[in-house]
Curated annotation (Swiss-Prot):
Gene3D superfamilies: Aspartate Aminotransferase, domain 1 (3.90.1150.10), Type I PLP-dependent aspartate aminotransferase-like (Major domain) (3.40.640.10). Homotetramer. Its cofactor is pyridoxal 5'-phosphate. It comes from Shewanella sediminis (strain HAW-EB3). It comes from the Bacteria. Pathway: Amino-acid degradation; L-tryptophan degradation via pyruvate pathway; indole and pyruvate from L-tryptophan: step 1/1. InterPro entries: ArAA_b-elim_lyase/Thr_aldolase, Beta-eliminating_lyase, PyrdxlP-dep_Trfase, PyrdxlP-dep_Trfase_major, PyrdxlP-dep_Trfase_small, TNase. This is Tryptophanase. The modification N6-(pyridoxal phosphate)lysine is found at K265.
Length: 465
């Protein structure tokens, strides 16, 4: 993969400090062998997430100075609504503090509508692949989260353009099994984080929406990385090579009735999110009603005016094709370095991260001992790099039985923040993992020292076996 130079100049820098092995061992022990609990100053390169960790532009920083912090009716809210309608075509917007804020005000409304309007009794949400907080909010509201991603996503070694697609036959079968009246919503996650940041094709989004309309099931687009998904459609899907990013994004969101958005990803702000409804006034009012006590007044939703302005501007920057080309190529460059060294990854690489196949790299560690978490710890000890587990630890336990779920993939996610690290950092990361490959057989599994009941991977503590 050819190295693409950064399409920006650096105006401000933040110093980072390398620690020695002894310091890292002490820090990881104090964190209970959980990189989430490390202090940021103990991390050299932070690949935990791309959420809120990107660098804002000079245009966004200028927007911060134009913040209108009025409690109600902030002009920044109306600027944000203009950006939402420009890109998504949705007219009804509720700002929230981040993506999970959108989930907590929307999902109960969808469950209530399922019960009162469609006569359902057992709320089911179907997705190509729910992410952790999405599934968590569903389960905390008494629902069940089911995944029907294409089986091709689980073959990490084989190239396939659309490893984020729904398996349409499984989608139809799941609706038939549980009854359409019990399906609170179908959630189209773009890109599909848990399958490796993999894109969903336009044809698949269209087909999912047609199935949903046939059964009168609402479709939510979980749109944290909608720009990256649109870029892959332009690059890979016949008929879209000459379309603009705006045209592709506008069509994508025709195949949904509402959206949740963590603005901390593609729009490149440090905090914020959206819950938007295309044209359903009654649902919009219900969401607004929940927003006020849980997030804040309906024209700020937990966001400062200055952050709404930065978000309104960042939506335009995140959809810039030159930037997206650089971003996707930077991720692919790291992935190719690892593949050339014989390190198994989800192939092809997605838009925001390289996903290392820990099950293949550490075949001696079973799923219930969390091989990807063990690999994350080894990477931190080797080079001060913080990554994150996407596997059985994240998947959690069956709500009814408490039995450990077994993830179809055990992945370590190397998440690349936007406009933060250079390609030299990518080389450093690759060199560290290549060094670990030679000692992989010596790595050990983990068991719980403390296991929280919900979203356990964030605050759990472990012992090494």
């Amino acid at each position: 993969m050819k190295r693409i130079p950064e399409p920006f100049r650096i105006k401000m820098v933040e110093s980072i400090k390398m620690t020695n092995l002894e310091d890292r061992e002490q820090a990881l022990t104090q964190a209970g062998l959980n990189p989430f609990l490390l202090r940021s100053e103990d991390v050299y390169i932070d690949l935990l997430t791309d959420s809120g960790t990107g660098a804002m532009s000079d245009v966004q920083w200028a927007g911060l100075m134009m913040g209108d912090e009025s409690y109600a009716g902030s002009r920044n809210y109306f600027n944000l609504c203009e950006s939402v309608e420009h890109f998504f075509g949705y007219k009804l917007t509720v700002p929230v503090h981040q993506g999970r804020g959108a989930e907590q005000i929307l999902f109960p409304c969808l469950i209530e509508r399922m019960r009162q309007v469609r006569g359902g009794t057992e709320p089911i949400f179907i997705s190509n692949y729910h992410f952790d907080t999405t599934a968590g909010h569903i389960e905390m509201n008494g629902g069940k989260a089911l995944n029907v991603v294409t089986e091709k996503a689980f073959d990490t070694e084989s190239y396939y353009d659309w490893k984020g697609d729904f398996d349409l036959d499984k989608l139809r079968d799941t609706i038939a099994t549980y009854g359409a009246n019990n399906i609170a919503a179908i959630i189209t996650t773009v890109t599909c984080n848990s399958s490796g940041g993999q894109p969903v094709s336009m044809a698949n989004m269209r087909a999912v929406y047609e199935i949903a309309q046939k059964h009168d099931i609402p479709v939510v687009i979980d749109s944290a990385r909608y720009c990256e998904n649109a870029y892959f459609i332009k690059q890979r899907e016949p008929g879209y090579e000459d379309s603009s990013m705006l045209e592709i994004i506008r069509e994508m969101f025709q195949y949904g009735d509402m959206l949740t958005l963590s603005a901390k990803k593609d729009p490149m702000v440090n905090i914020g999110g959206l819950c938007c409804v295309r044209d359903h006034e009654e649902l919009f009012r219900a969401v607004q009603t929940r927003c006020v006590p849980m997030e804040g007044f309906v024209t700020y939703g937990g966001m400062a005016g200055r952050d709404m302005e930065a978000l309104a501007r960042g939506m335009h920057e995140g959809a810039d094709e030159d930037f997206l080309h650089y971003r996707v190529c930077q991720v692919a460059y790291l992935g190719e370095r690892l593949r050339e060294a014989g390190i198994p990854i989800q192939y092809p690489t997605g838009g925001h991260a390289v996903f290392v196949d820990a099950a293949k790299m550490l075949p001696h560690i079973p799923a219930h001992q969390f091989p990807a978490q063990s690999l994350c710890n080894a990477l931190y000890l080797e080079a001060g790099i913080r990554a994150v587990e996407i596997g059985s630890l994240l998947l959690g336990r069956e709500p009814e039985t408490g039995e450990q779920k077994v993830s179809p993939m055990e992945l370590m996610r190397l998440t690349i923040p936007r406009r933060v690290y250079t390609n030299d950092h990518m080389d450093y990361i690759a060199d560290a993992l290549i060094a670990i490959k030679d000692q992989a057989a010596s790595l050990k599994g983990l068991t719980f020292d403390y296991e929280p009941p919900v979203l356990r991977h964030f605050t759990a503590k472990f012992n090494s076996l």
